[in-house]
Amino acid sequence: MSLESEESEVDLVGGAVLPGTLPEVLRAELVAFRRDLHMHPELGNQEFRTTAAIKERLERAGLAPRVLSSGTGVICDIGVMDGTPVGTGPDTGTGPDTGTGAAPGTGILALRADIDGLPIPDMKSECPYRSTVPDRAHACGHDVHTTVVLGTGLVLAELHRQGLLPRPVRLIFQPAEEVLPGGAADALLDGALDGVGRIVAVHCDPRVDAGRIGLREGPITSACDRLEIALDGPGGHTARPHLTTDLVTAAARVVTDVPALVGRRVDSRSGLAITWGRVESGHAPNVIPQHAELSGTVRCLDLETWRLAPDIVVAAIDEVANLHRAKSEINYVRGVPPVVNEAGVTELLRDAMIARRGAESVENTEQSLGGEDFSWYLEHVPGAMARLGVRPPGERTIRDLHQGDFDVDEHAITVGVELFTAAALL
């Protein structure tokens, strides 16, 4: 791939060389690559086809990608001499053990993408690139994230060959973001942050128009944990609930009363929210069941509340279950802390987007209650995540994340590549 074409002019912005419009041949290739991923979604830690496709394309560009020891996911360096990270310094993080990071502001710039799909059916009935895998879909935009980082890698590899890459860059294609506590731990244990000084990522946002990004300094996502509860009782006849444990009522009370109790035991400004995704019990209308199961998520806005949440939530569940004479077994699964965008890296992304598309292409965004394991990287090095607009301009209908009809305006791929390329060059 060459960037030398009528459509690849260069601009000088703040002394940095920035490639202009991506060559049409590369834009078309990236769209085709994304559509291929979209048609073949793979769940967390099962992304073997996706991993092979990423590795093959990077090798074809003359790079030396390596697959994570877990078997899926890829790490690939550009401009790192002899494979030795530069600017290595001590790691001071508090998340999963990572190995070594660089001192802030030095070392490698890492670009991270997640590569896994979701266990939901693709509901786009007349889409030529809809999922070909039953009950599997790329409904969170990870196919786009992957393509953006891949495309950026191809551009930066060419610029490196031309002597125009001012700093080393690492591409991180991470598996299993959708699986708590996230596949970031595998990437970190495989040295994803060795020598890294800063890290950036994007996440598709169907509420932001394609051609724009959303940015926010400080927390941009929330902490997210998983909650699994089993309730047990002797069961009995629905004619005599007073002689047994009415397990359906007990489960219903857990659903309604636990969030209310928890809401009175933490600061309301913390935004702690419990939302249930599954409640199951019973098989007959006239039989009080002996067993019930509930599962859901616990989300909160700040790190301090996240640290307190397990004890508070578990105590509230026990209280409600005991009140209804139900035995409770609680599995509180730790998930991820909030993604907290560091000021300097947030400004880097802002400057990069403005350099490519003007000040009007950046909008301020609110903190989301969604969880993202990108946060684990930020426990060790400064970084930031931008919301990549994927809504067709003028479109009123929002095809939301984690819904079977989710899709994107594929112009967002070009925008993401331009953003990351400019960030690497500024």
Where are these predicted regions, by residue range?
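Metal-dependent amide/peptide-bond hydrolase catalytic core
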Residues: 2-7, 252-426
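Acidic/His- and Gly-rich active-site-bordering loop/insert found
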Residues: 3-138, 143, 147, 151-167
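General structural feature for long, well-ordered alpha-helical segments within catalytic domains
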Residues: 26-33, 46, 50-57, 107, ...
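Divalent metal-coordination and catalytic microenvironments
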Residues: 37, 58, 111, 142, ...
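A structural signal for isolated positions on well-ordered beta-strands in alpha/beta enzyme cores
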Residues: 66, 170-172, 329
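Histidine/acidic-residue-rich, glycine-tolerant segments that coordinate divalent metal ions
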Residues: 83, 117-137, 143-144, 159-289, ...
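Non-cysteine beta-strand/loop elements that form the S-adenosyl-L-methionine
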Residues: 110-112, 121, 227-229, 385-391
